[in-house]
């Protein structure tokens, strides 16, 4: 594991740390590299302030992040079964954001996944659909948002073009003064580095 090999610290919640330490596939984790963080308690890494916030997902104490450096901020929100006012507040007034657009609901419903897995993904502790990603984006749009990345797309239940078009449609049709062309919206690549954005 890269952390063990290069001595890179891991900042994670207690629940995630416990789950990692129990996973035999990860091998022995040097506990000195694991730094426990807590939801809604900002911490610093050099000039960066990291604000972890609770997200609804069926994992071991997962969090989203709001990263701040000076007057600039970036948000990361993946593995969300749903969003609420608390999540919206943590994603307001960002310069850039990475949002989950995991699946197209219809593709998931008619796809090959077993019923229990479909229900898990569609549930409140599952993953955000393209439509809900667009609706969440509508709640956090503002004049100074420079970039939106759509991420964590399902290989089986989504396409890059479909995620992009659906999110853009939600923005254009949403109850807000913006249109999708007002912002740089792009799909984060699974296997390639995305475009570098300066905020």
Question: Regions from the language model: what does each represent?
Answer:
Residues 85-185:
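Cap/insert and terminal regions of metallo-dependent hydrolase folds
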């Amino acid at each position: 594991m890269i952390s063990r090999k290069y001595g890179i610290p891991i900042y994670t919640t207690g629940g995630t740390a416990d789950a990692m330490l129990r996973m035999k596939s990860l091998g022995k984790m040097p506990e000195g590299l694991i730094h426990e963080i807590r939801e809604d308690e900002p911490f610093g890494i050099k000039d960066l302030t990291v604000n972890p916030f609770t997200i609804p997902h069926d994992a071991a104490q997962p969090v989203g992040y709001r990263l701040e450096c000076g007057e600039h901020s970036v948000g990361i929100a993946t593995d969300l079964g749903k969003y609420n006012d608390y999540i919206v507040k943590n994603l307001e007034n960002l310069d850039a954001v990475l949002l989950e657009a995991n699946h197209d609901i219809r593709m998931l419903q008619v796809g090959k996944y077993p019923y229990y897995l479909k229900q898990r993904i569609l549930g409140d502790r599952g993953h955000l659909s393209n439509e809900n990603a667009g609706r969440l984006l509508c709640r956090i749009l503002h004049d100074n948002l420079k970039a939106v990345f759509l991420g964590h797309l399902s290989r089986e239940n989504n396409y890059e073009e479909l995620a992009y078009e659906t999110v853009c449609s939600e923005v254009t049709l949403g109850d807000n003064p913006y249109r999708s062309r007002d912002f740089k919206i792009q799909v984060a690549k699974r296997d390639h580095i995305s475009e570098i954005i300066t905020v």
